[in-house]
Structures are given as C-alpha cells and as structure tokens.
Amino acid sequence: MELRYLRYFVAVAEARNFTRAAHDLGISQPPLSQQIQRLEREIGTPLLRRLTRGVELTEAGESFYVDACQILALSDAALEKTKGIARGMNGSLVPGITSSAAFHSQIFSLLYQFQQRYPAVALRQVEGNMATLMHALGEAELDIAFVRLPCESSKAFNLRIIAEEPMVIALHRSHPLSGESALSLAQLSDAVPVIFPPEVAPGLYEQVYDGCRRAGVDMSRARQSSQISSSISMVDAGFGFALVPQSMTCICLPNVTWHPLQDASLKTEIAIAWRRFERSRTVKRFLEMF
C-alpha cells in the first residue's frame, strides 16, 4: 500500500467532499476517486459512504482514518529525522572522556554549547581510561574522545588540542611544606609519591613518573591509586603527595593543600580525537564549533 493512497484518503475524510479534497491536494477529482476506489478494493471493504452532497466515513473508514493519520505522522517524522541526521541537526553524539580530563571545565562547556545549538541531538557521555576510549573510538562505539596528551594510541586518529594545563602538587595539611606556595619536586624527595596506574593515561603517567624520578623522589616507595581523582583522596588520608593536572584542584578535601609546580615544563594537553575520514555530519557539526 502506497503512502499517497493514505494521504488521499485522509484528505477526503477531512474534507468530506471529493471536490474540495482534490483542490487541496492539487489534483483533479476523477483520479482521486479512482485512487480511493483502488484503496477500498485493496482493503476489501468500503471506507466512504457516497452521499448526494459529499461523503461520510463508514465504521471501517473511521477506524482506518485514525490509523492512517498515525502512519502518515510517523512517516513524516521519520523523514524529517533522517534529513536532520544527514544535516547533523539531530541524531546522537557519543563522546568519550578520559577520567583524567573529566574535571576540566572546557570539555563540558563545549558539550553544553553544542547541546544548546543542536537540542535535537542526543548526547551520551562515556568515561573511561585512555586505552578503553581509544579502542572504543576505533570500533565506532564512540564518535569523538577527549584525551590526554601525550598518548601513543591516539596517533591513529585526528587530534585537535583544546586546552593546556600545568601540573600541581597535592600535599597533606600536616606536611612541613603545606604552608608554602610554589614547590619543586626536589623539595619532596623524601616524601612518598601517590601515582595512578599507567593505563589511566599512559603519557601523563610517564611524565609524572620521570619528573619525580629526575627530582630524586624514590619511586619504589610509590603508592598506587585506582584513578587520578582517587590519588587526591589518598593524599587527604595521609598516604603521601600527588602530582596531578591543575583542573583537579576543584576537588576540595579538608586535609589537602594545593601548590603550583616551579617546573613549568611539566604540563599536559587535552585534545579531541576523531576517526580519520569521519563521515558523520553530527561529528563535523561539533568540530565546526572551534
């Protein structure tokens, strides 16, 4: 059954007159009457009762009218939705966010701006470590990913840097240097470092590990946390000190003091990664924002 038959029938049912319906549809009356008769033959029962001055719906016609309106509405909505997806105006966007960057305000600011500009696009964020995100992006389970650089596995994708931030030191309030402002890692050579696992952010892990080692910190004494954020909780509990990205200073714990790092060379970048030869208009719309 063709959709145009349904449109013709609905037009006649609402106009209660073949002549007016034909005028509304922009066709002549004889072809319209023929199409309605063909529809009735296909269904196997009359839908309209022909009167002297128009038509009225039969009982079957009343039921069919309700269903026809729903089918046409769904068809029109599906068509508009598909057109919108092709234009990147609706559909969905699944961004991955590495847990080490989840506290950086610019990421969610960008996502919010995109949602405001394209409210019909459904956003579903996925948080994970770098290895998980890079695999998911390669398997098209994610559309984009916010990653920490440097990252060897991200080199297979297009990258665009969106932020750079320095590293800072988290100390327990009881530490003798907690009242100081900027600190060097060499001043903490006798302290116990708290460090996250390498799979969380491999490049950042190497930076932190090598930076501490070069400053004389004994990394064999290091305590390992499950995530960067949990390393701050371990500092709060008294396990040692942590070297983390500046955006993590938004985590306020009662026993943690924050200190800028004197070595300005220790810094990290956040980038957006997406697949090469990406065809999604929604992804392209997002990238057009900056």
UniProtKB/Swiss-Prot annotation:
Instruction: State whether keyword NAD applies.
Output: no
Q: Pull one GO CC term from this UniProt entry.
A: protein-DNA complex
Keywords recorded for this protein, A-Z: DNA-binding, Transcription, Transcription regulation
Superkingdom field: Bacteria
Q: Please list the GO terms describing molecular function.
A: DNA binding; DNA-binding transcription factor activity
Explain the purpose of this protein.
Regulator of the budABC operon for 2,3-butanediol synthesis.
Output this protein's name.
HTH-type transcriptional regulator BudR
Q: Which gene encodes it?
A: budR
